[in-house]
């Protein structure tokens, strides 16, 4: 099929060119210059046709079986690659539905991140096919969802829950190592393959983490969101995923959400206070780990490194998930570039790389009907093709074998690398005969409300061993093999009670309001040391001091780029036909000859200051004529420093002023990139001068 496609392509191009020339032969022969001016106009017409034919060939390499689901941007279909026979998922995104820049950016982020990530527990993006009307993402196929698995089987035993949690956390750690935070971890975004292995999907809400920057967008599901996310506070990123992982671990072991309420403000209040109950029958190691992950203060919350060192997590940890994980550092192949042999197994010897490359190319040659030389030529071309798509699909299977099981090089080619990974559910899949179950109640009773629990709790509290030893398990811990429809429906309702409240939580509600009084917070110990200047001023008074210090040091403000977009409507409502500045100037009797750009404008964020600091002005004010020509010559590469100053609220009544260097400006007006600056001392010198100026009295 494919070779005939190439012949049709050549035939179509020749017919197209002759069809263009045919009317020219019937007309009188025009001048030579006019001929040369007309012929180049026909050449670009062949290029879109050639690209369209190649795109149709790439799409024709997949046979669509059925529709898996439909989202806000398009459909997801199950397909089979004709050349390799492997099942893939085609995520078809309609361009007309990407009506806003935010939607288009979300799709672009998902494509960019999935092309970067290569991990056994992250959905792989094989290739992307773009047409004028659609964007087709060829993804790894995983047929199940962790959410449906929990609904069907209920809460899990400790070993099975640990296995799912280990796979999920190691994949999240891999994302964080590549500066990517997911921000929407939940059972619906954790897919399961045929061997019940976790695959993280849906990176549309993800963000790249950069040093010194904080995220503020409230996104994700409210029940799995961290307190700093629903509160609209700034967060770095990794601590948000840690909180979501803790909620998911709780769901795996208990079968319900730790924070749940039908009223959104009440739900937010519970999350903000961190009020949840741990069942008495939960394993002690898992309970302690959940307590460390579900800490309201992100500074005190457990990190990925802390979780990896936890004894409960390291129990029965597979070898391929243990540190170090350099085997997963490969970041895929760009279809627009030539494919090299060492891409298939970067850490393997050269002979092994060549052997694996030959196995992949031979399989493609046999299944697709191409000669081996044609396959090699297509792989070296700097453009996408159907051969490259097939190579990437077969290549992923080989990489999984080499990365997880080095001994797989000696196994037959068709063996799957994931078949050896046992499922904890298979050991408990034996069916037993049980009596008909009564109708499940929708009323949940706290275990602490039962008399037996209360009596046991009081006795252990008197003995002083409430948190040391778990009580006797009064509830049968044997998990049911079969679940009734009523139980499944109730579990599904409990796990996603607010399915419509998925995105932009800060727009759906304001700050959470406390519904009922909760236990008073514990007294925190005062901080014994800090970096910077101690001040008892309120935040606006502190900012006023900073503004005065910057003015004395000769700094100038950089206009806020977001000011016009954020305050245009407010100015129009406040001023009517004209602006507030115009009416104010008119009331004072001033002329309109003042440059509008020189008028004072408040920044979009009053707690964020962006200034340009002329280094020569600082020298004149602070050092006078003490500088020597040699020192001035040393500062000539940078003529100005761009500085971002922002104030954060660490705790109630405790604030932190952060100084961040946003770049160095040269004499030509060019802003140096971060990688072009090799020394931090110019920025530290400026920050020290600002701190000294703040320490001085007015």
From Swiss-Prot:
This is Sucrose non-fermenting protein kinase 1. Component of the AMP-activated protein kinase complex also known as the SNF1 kinase complex (Snf1c), a heterotrimeric complex composed of a catalytic subunit alpha and 2 regulatory subunits beta and gamma. The gene is SNF1. Keywords: ATP-binding, Carbohydrate metabolism, Cytoplasm, Kinase, Nucleotide-binding, Nucleus, Serine/threonine-protein kinase, Transferase, Virulence. It comes from Fusarium virguliforme. The lineage of its organism: Eukaryota, Fungi, Dikarya, Ascomycota, Pezizomycotina. Disruption phenotype: Impairs the expression of the galactose oxidase gene which abolishes galactose utilization and causes poor growth on xylose, arabinose and sucrose. Impairs severely the ability to cause sudden death syndrome (SDS) on challenged soybean plants through preventing to colonize the xylem vessels and phloem tissue during infection. One of its GO terms (cellular component) is nucleus. Its EC number is 2.7.11.1. Residues 62-313 form the Protein kinase domain.
